[in-house]
């Protein structure tokens, strides 16, 4: 849950990973899931729960990386980035970073189109099928 207004993000209160797991279980007991859209994931626990679900369910998954607010506030714990790269992105069909998010995910500063292409290629090495 984010505390924010039109000026920016003031604070973030992550939902415990167990709640995310229980919500996924509740939905999958109720209906067939054909695809998954992933948005803001703030910590390793939540990322692991989603990655585990995708690992055992092999669904098409779009990861709309929400890493930084428009006002520059970091929305993901720095220590969660490696879990995102190693455990979640390999299960994603499509990853949709904007430029600042692509810089964070790839570790490549983006100043021109060539940098953008290099960052995209780096993100592909994490195992997603497209970026």
Which ranges hold each PLM region?
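Glycine/proline-rich, positively charged
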Residues: 66, 72-74, 100-103
């Amino acid at each position: 849950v984010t505390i924010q207004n039109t000026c920016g993000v003031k604070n973030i209160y992550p939902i415990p990973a167990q709640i995310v797991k229980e919500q996924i279980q509740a939905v999958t007991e109720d209906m067939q899931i054909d695809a998954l859209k992933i948005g803001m994931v703030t910590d390793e626990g939540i990322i692991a729960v989603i990655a585990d679900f995708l690992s055992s369910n092999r669904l098409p998954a779009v990861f709309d990386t929400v890493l930084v607010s428009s006002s520059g506030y970091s929305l993901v714990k720095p220590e969660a980035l490696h879990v995102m790269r190693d455990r979640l992105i390999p299960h994603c069909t499509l990853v949709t970073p904007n430029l600042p998010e692509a810089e964070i995910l790839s570790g490549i500063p983006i100043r021109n189109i060539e940098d953008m292409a290099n960052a995209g290629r780096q993100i592909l090495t994490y195992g997603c099928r497209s970026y």
